[in-house]
Amino acid sequence: DGYEHWLTDRRTEADALPEHLHPVADSGIMDGKDALKRLRTGLSLLTDADSTSTASQQARKAFAFMNRTMREQRIRSQIAGLRAADRSLTVDQASKVIDAEGDKAASWRAFQLAFILMQLPSIVDPTVPRRSGDIPRAELLFFPTGGGKTEAYLGLAAFTFGIRRLQGVIETPSGVIDGRDGVAVLMRYTLRLLTSQQFLRATTLMCAAEIARQEDPATWGEEPFRIGLWVGSSVSPKRFAEAEQQITDVRNNDGNSAYGLTVLQFSSCPWCGTLINPKADVVAVKATQRVHVYCGDKLAECPFSPGGSAGDGLPVLTVDDEIYRNPPTFLLATVDKFARLAREGEAASLFGYVSQRCERHGYKHPDTATAVCGAQDHAAKKEGGRTYPKASVKAVDRLRPPDLIIQDELHLITGALGTAVGLFEAAVDTLSSWEMGDGDDAALVKPLVIASTATVRNAQDQVRKLYGRQVQIFPPQVLSV
């Protein structure tokens, strides 16, 4: 209602403008009214009291999940930051510092919550025209640097994690789509340095999501929430053997340096801030072809430490073939990495195209290397003080492809880079599409595309050429830039 009153005041201002400015002013106010309508639609989805409305019930659960995990992400990120600045601080001491800030330590800004509410209908119902119509739209979050754009789209990502788990298996004209696993959100960056900076914040969110899942697997499923970093081979390893060799080399070196250990992307635990020992806390397991990164907490108070409640350590994947075999819920990538789609068939698993699943090694695509999982059955095996039970390979349905694609720093995708990225967008859009409904009523579902930037120019033209979509800028500028 407050936004509606504000728009009414802008209408009065517009009427007082010179006649030649009225068309532009009218267009700006219409954009504001459209945002108001969408905001109310999203809010009504959460407040619908109809007990028979499955969509509203699921939306409320996913919204609560989002708020819980984002609160934990904010608080835990600050705790880790305080402990990084002062290693003498304990987790309890850092927590008290954050608690003293009250609600300010973890609260939404108005534009963040409004942006999320506006997108909820497109996530809950994948067939809505704004997302999957003949002329779908891309949503552009335009806000100054440091204003909180990251939290806005991380919040929407968390909602997406939750709603997919609640919707579960969906019948489609071409067969079953399984939303209980697979990549839910695909987030792309242009600069590799920027990816590393954001990876820590996103990992903290995934830690919060995984703890919530473990507390209530009946609601949030048996499959772990994980985050993956899919970037160039100079930044992270392509194969398990490369990662294993890195770990061996670091352990054989003098000192405690993590130089050359690209499988480890942060020096301290994103959940509690405890330092990670590259010689002891990064473990390669041949039996599963997995690399586990643990928090360095020796008292096992952190759930992601050895002996902690999480079991497998931090929910992080940084090796390409691990990512293909265990498609992470949240995948962070650089735009150049999508060139691998033309050369690595197993990367199709990121879009749900899997044919089998090994109980030990993960999902299989016809191009999965037989050196990783070439048998139909595996005998029990002991390694590192742990026994891995016998495992078999079983046929599975297609995993649900990404529902949300986030492009950070859109203004950098221009010129020659924009031309190259645009070539892959059609492929990504096609790989992420699937049909929902029955017979003639079946609708082609496309991913929701969100872009963010602190500076924008010719956004309509840029988005049309990159994604073949119209663009909706939020917040609408109305009468003032």
Each model region followed by its residue ranges:
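N-terminal helicase ATP-binding lobe
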Residues: 1-481
